[in-house]
C-alpha cells in the first residue's frame, strides 16, 4: 500500500477541505480519467482497492497513472483508553481530495473499457466521481 517513506512531522491536525482543486484538475498523462466531484478523504487501502479493480478489468492492456498520494497521517487511540493523555499513534494514511481532482488516468485502451473499469473502481471510493476524457487543445 502507499505510504510516505519519511515525514517531517509524525502527527497532523485534521483541518477542513474547503474549495476546489486547481492543481491536478486536468487529464495530463493518459486519455481518460476519474475526477472527484465531492470532497473527502481516501485511505491508502481504498486507493489500492480501486487500482486492483481497474487492473482486473483492463487485464494486460493499457497504462494506469495514480494521480493522488496518501501523505496525511491519521492517529487513533487504543481501545478502552480514557480520554486525555495525549494524541494517539499514527494508524493509517489518507489523501485529502477536493472537488475537481483527477484521481486516476488511463491510456492504451478503448473508451468503453476505460469507462467500465473506472466506473467499477469508483464503487470502491467514498466520494462521488465522474468519467472524463482528455480535452483536445
Swiss-Prot record:
One of its GO terms (molecular function) is rRNA binding. Residues 1-24 are annotated as: Disordered. One of its GO terms (cellular component) is cytosolic large ribosomal subunit. SUPFAM superfamilies: Ribosomal protein L16p/L10e. InterPro entries: Ribosomal_uL16, Ribosomal_uL16_bact-type, Ribosomal_uL16_CS, Ribosomal_uL16_dom, Ribosomal_uL16_sf. Gene3D superfamilies: Ribosomal protein L10e/L16. NCBIfam families: rplP_bact. Belongs to the universal ribosomal protein uL16 family. Part of the 50S ribosomal subunit. This is Large ribosomal subunit protein uL16. It comes from Leptospira borgpetersenii serovar Hardjo-bovis (strain JB197). The lineage of its organism: Bacteria, Pseudomonadati, Spirochaetota, Spirochaetia, Leptospirales. The gene is rplP.
